[in-house]
């Protein structure tokens, strides 16, 4: 849920390992982290904020101004400084030491339920699994493409996925892996 409990069309995408991605949001409408970072702040469903108002509030706090000045120079926080700070922060969030990662290195053992989840994830539909790894593969569990996730579209067809960015019929109901 977003601002004042408003319900959006999609769940939030993961914010880790963004340095390896080549598009952002489930529909790929942003090509870089920098293109992405300010959109949720200004979206009427997510944070419903006016960027100038956010900058005004940030600039009212002396500690924020001092921190931004140390990092970026000028004393006044600008939109460019804000997106740069958010981009820099997001690019530091890296996952590579989860329990699953540790199990691959034989540092820990998955419990039976976790191991069943692993089996389902990596086993094809034809062999009794969920087939997740057909799209979610490699070290980042993504092939960085757009695919139909196999779920039925919303009854009102309100979320056309990648099609809303490209306008191409072939992109209807495709989402980032």
Show which residues each predicted segment covers:
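Post-cleavage N-terminal segment of exported redox proteins
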Residues: 39-42, 47-125, 133, 137-142
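Short glycine/threonine-rich turn/loop motifs
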Residues: 1-39, 101-177
């Amino acid at each position: 849920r977003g601002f004042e409990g408003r319900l959006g069309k999609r769940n939030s995408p993961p914010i880790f390992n963004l340095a390896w991605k080549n598009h952002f949001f489930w529909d790929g409408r942003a090509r870089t982290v920098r293109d992405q970072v300010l959109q949720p702040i200004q979206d009427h469903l997510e944070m419903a904020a006016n960027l100038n108002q956010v900058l005004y509030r940030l600039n009212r706090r002396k500690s924020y101004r001092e921190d931004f000045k140390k990092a970026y120079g000028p004393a006044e926080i600008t939109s460019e400084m804000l997106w740069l700070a958010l981009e820099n922060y997001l690019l530091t969030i890296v996952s590579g030491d989860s329990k699953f990662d540790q199990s691959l290195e034989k540092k820990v053992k998955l419990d039976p339920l976790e191991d069943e989840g692993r089996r389902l994830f990596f086993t094809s539909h034809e062999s009794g699994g969920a087939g997740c790894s057909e799209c979610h593969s490699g070290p980042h569990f993504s092939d960085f493409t757009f695919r139909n996730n196999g779920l039925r579209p919303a009854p009102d067809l309100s979320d056309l996925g990648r099609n809303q960015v490209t306008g191409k019929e072939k992109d209807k109901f495709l989402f980032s892996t």
